[in-house]
Regions:
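Peripheral interaction segments used for macromolecular assembly
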Residues: 1-259
């Protein structure tokens, strides 16, 4: 018999199949274990906040290199999320009703990632802040073909004016407008807040910007930025969540079923 002629007494196809099964089982185990780097261990509310890991167990910490050169370890010890809600029934898994002001409760459509980094997102090229107002970047400007949004009145879903657009915040990486900066006026209070572009419609002929998410007076509670010229990722979470929560909680009528 020639050297290496194993096919005459070994079923190579069957061995290949078995090898594939072993490899695939290992792959499933690896992927399922890596999937537990975030969100685990689970908290079982039925047995006194017991931690549930299941099989396979949660892997050890692993470092992930970020674009800014920092390293993030996961899994890592983090404080538990603050749940501003109470179950509407006694059985496990019952829906939660918001506590206090539902617009700021972080529940339902107003939920936000509580552990998001409280630093501005950065561009990949110069590592500068990604989202900034137009007044800080002279190289960017609104195209003359677009509506002149500066100076437009901002109206809530009740049709009452909440303020006036004084600037636009752009994404320097994507070259799009992310927010409009609104100078508030009574009944919306005072100061400036950001209005996300995906929660508004523009009426150029009427010189109006309208949102159907919140009332004019509710602009007063929109989360504000710590810095007048940058917005952190955590602040973006809270701002978007506030307007998103208005889709269900802005009025009492929105919280009830249609039928």
């Amino acid at each position: 018999m020639q050297t290496g002629a194993i096919t005459s007494y070994i079923d190579v196809a069957q061995l290949t199949l078995y090898a594939f099964w072993v490899f695939f089982a290992g792959l499933i185990y690896y992927l399922h274990r890596e999937n537990k780097r975030e969100g685990y261990p689970l908290i079982d509310e039925r047995v006194g906040q017991a931690k549930v890991e299941g099989f396979p167990f949660v892997p050890g910490p692993k470092g992930f290199l970020q674009s800014d050169g920092s390293v993030v370890l996961v899994p890592r010890a983090e404080p538990a999320d603050v749940v501003n809600g109470r179950p509407i029934a006694a059985w496990p898994g019952a829906p939660l009703a918001p506590k206090g002001d539902p617009m700021l409760s972080g529940m339902g459509p107003g939920a936000w990632a509580q552990h998001r980094a409280d630093v501005p997102d950065h561009c990949f090229d110069d590592h500068g802040p990604k989202i900034v107002p137009l007044r800080t970047v002279p190289d960017f400007f609104l195209a003359w073909e677009d509506p002149k949004v500066l100076g437009m009145a901002v109206l809530g879903l009740d049709g009452v004016q909440a303020g006036t657009v004084v600037d636009a915040w752009i994404d320097r990486s994507e070259v799009v407008i992310r927010y409009l900066e609104v100078e508030l006026a009574p009944p919306a209070g005072t100061g400036r807040v950001l209005l996300p572009m995906n929660f508004m419609t523009m009426k150029p002929k009427l010189r109006q910007v309208r949102t159907n998410t919140i009332l004019a007076e509710q602009f007063a509670a929109v989360p504000k930025t710590r810095d007048n010229e940058t917005v952190t990722m955590l602040e973006e979470e809270k701002i978007m969540a506030y307007y998103g929560g208005g889709l269900m909680y802005a009025t009492a009528r929105r919280q009830e079923p249609l039928l």
